[in-house]
Amino acid sequence: MPSYRPPKIASSEITPRQVYLRRREFLGAATLGAMALYGAGKASAAAFSAVESKYKVDEKTTPIKDVTTYNNFYEFGLDKGDPAALSGEFKPLPWAVKVDGMVNKPGTFDVEALIKEFPIEERTYRMRCVEAWSMVIPWNGFPLAALLNKVEPLGSAKYVAFETVVRPEEMPGQKGFFQSLDWPYVEGLRLDEARHPLTLLAVGLYGETLPNQNGAPIRLVVPWKYGFKGIKSIVRITLTDQQPKNTWQVTNPQEYGFYANVNPAVDHPRWSQASERRIGGSGFFGASRRPTLPFNGYADEVASLYAGMDLKANF
């Protein structure tokens, strides 16, 4: 795998200054900030003793207001603003993730304990939605590989399946009229994708506790894939030898595949993927248009995972 070449850019240079300063102030009082954001429950201060990692991009980050108010999270509603408006009753603590299947050491793990166990990094990634819009987000989290190593996958395990929580009493989209999706929301990766150093379990963004509308308290971030692969509010991770289906693949297999790698050469049946709207930019309605990069700009790191594959057939 080619070595990662981080651009020479500091966090204070890519982040709007007022947000950067607020984040550093937050880090000095993480417990109070986390409790205020989560409401119920006591969040771990260790969650935000994050260190900046080599994983950065030489691009301006999306304003936190846009990151937290322009979301797809159908468990809370169909509109981009619904997750922020309708997730106030969702309780992200206490929270546990069950890891089972083809592993030597299955278990159910408290998220706060995982945050204390694994070093939390700050990673700034591009995020490309399949709907042809994008953001640049500074996440806080730990590699999924760290959790997988803890449970020791069997040699026969080839895939990793993920499952979102089902709480219709707190997630109005799960009991609303939009029932073309079967709950729980599910996703999957190949095991080598899941173990890749870029693949992250995020517990925060912009140095703060992960908001409900962004997938609290723990979500997946796979920056070279379309955003729907980033399953939110995870409650179960299963190692298997069978390729798992994902929710959108089941719902519309002609439009959504298992891999969902960002590919400007493979259009969605209803729109082009050659370019994207960068949310929070200076263009029309606050979005600027730019060419989409193969694998969302991470080709040097991940293209070898798909050597010899037909990327049009395996979309």
Swiss-Prot record:
Superkingdom of the organism of origin: Bacteria
Metal-binding listed as a keyword: yes
Record field: catalytic activity: L-methionyl-[protein] + a quinone + H2O = L-methionyl-(S)-S-oxide-[protein] + a quinol; L-methionyl-[protein] + a quinone + H2O = L-methionyl-(R)-S-oxide-[protein] + a quinol
Cofactors (names): Mo-molybdopterin
Signal peptide stretch: 1-45
UniProt cross-references to InterPro entries, sorted A to Z: MsrP (IPR022867), OxRdtase_Mopterin-bd_dom (IPR000572), OxRdtase_Mopterin-bd_sf (IPR036374), TAT_signal (IPR006311)
Gene Ontology MF annotations: metal ion binding; molybdopterin cofactor binding; oxidoreductase activity, acting on a sulfur group of donors, quinone or similar compound as acceptor
Classification via Pfam families: Oxidored_molyb
GO biological process annotation, one example: protein repair
Top EC class of this enzyme: oxidoreductase
GO cellular component terms given for this protein: periplasmic space
SUPFAM superfamilies from the UniProt entry: Oxidoreductase molybdopterin-binding domain
Cofactor note: Binds 1 Mo-molybdopterin (Mo-MPT) cofactor per subunit.
EC number(s) reported in the record: 1.8.5.-
List of residues binding Mo-molybdopterin: N71, Y74, E75, C129, T164, N214, R219, G230, I231, K232
Keyword Metal-binding: yes
Localization per Swiss-Prot or TrEMBL: Periplasm
Post-translational modification, as annotated: Predicted to be exported by the Tat system. The position of the signal peptide cleavage has not been experimentally proven.
HAMAP family recorded: MsrP
Subunit structure: Heterodimer of a catalytic subunit (MsrP) and a heme-binding subunit (MsrQ).
Family that this chain belongs to: Belongs to the MsrP family.
Purpose of the protein: Part of the MsrPQ system that repairs oxidized periplasmic proteins containing methionine sulfoxide residues (Met-O), using respiratory chain electrons. Thus protects these proteins from oxidative-stress damage caused by reactive species of oxygen and chlorine generated by the host defense mechanisms. MsrPQ is essential for the maintenance of envelope integrity under bleach stress, rescuing a wide series of structurally unrelated periplasmic proteins from methionine oxidation.
Protein name: Protein-methionine-sulfoxide reductase catalytic subunit MsrP
Organism: Rhizobium etli (strain ATCC 51251 / DSM 11541 / JCM 21823 / NBRC 15573 / CFN 42)
